[in-house]
């Protein structure tokens, strides 16, 4: 239960960071996808189910506040969290390369699927323009922010694991 509550608080914090804070630091109208960082981080650190749940909550938040249809972003973030969780077994906390790579790939696929769902299906075939003005800048910006945000998430996760383990040993 603690894991869920802490993850929920981190999702809300990342949502506020992405929508309120980084809005003032947008480069060319692009802000980093902090929600993808927390979704992929949750999956990597806790596994598929936790990543799936974090992705669902994150996606529903985006759907409610910014989506035209409820559920599209939820599905995209759920897939990102689930597939990030597949790498949980080979996750080493001191190695930032794997999580950063998963966040970059997850954000790229997320943006590409958004292009397909929202533009390509409406016969807007400007993939080059969308790639250079939306996808690549957001992925780069997200990667830069992930270098700073991921260690904070990792530290919170490690501290939470220590607290849970200490409280579990009290009852044994």
Describe every region a protein language model picked out.
Residues 1-172:
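Terminal, non-globular segments
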